[in-house]
Amino acid sequence: AWMQAMEKHLPELKEYVSTSGSPMYYIAEVMKKEFPEYKTVFVGPCMAKRLEAERNPNVDYVLIFEELQAAFDAAQINPATLEADKFAVESSAQGRRFPISGGVAGAVQFVVGDKAEYKPMKIDGLTKDSCKLLKRFVTKAPEDANMVEVMCCEGGCIAGPGAVIPAKRGTVLVENYVKTSKDIEC
């Protein structure tokens, strides 16, 4: 959502924005290489992923959590009663924190460590005021930050419009999941 908002409302920031793709982008790319005959489906809380998927030939479909929940309800499936599968590759604690505001900045902090001065700033929810602040960065960079993480939804992606639980509960669940995860290997 941030990339779309920037392109539409803050194009003067484009040269300062990372060209790195989203996790959806990279996972879909890997899946299409490994399993080209399969369809890829992104499932998450973000409506903006639909437009991102239109630009990414590796993503075939996007479902928001509300849609998936409706399908489960219609089929009388309660995911909480199902046995969890083990993933072939476990995600890092830093990667699992991405959907929470501050998660991306925290992952960068972990990797940078003490190798460089790192001063992150969080934009937690894209509002008129935060857009004005970001526009000012074009002419005067913030002295107290050298990296800005922007989350369009307050609280992060966990609070996207397609979420089926309150953001605070989702954040607690993600943080508990993170506790079971290993750190990234740098």
Where is each model-derived feature located?
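Iron-sulfur-associated redox domains of electron-transfer enzymes in respiratory
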Residues: 1-186
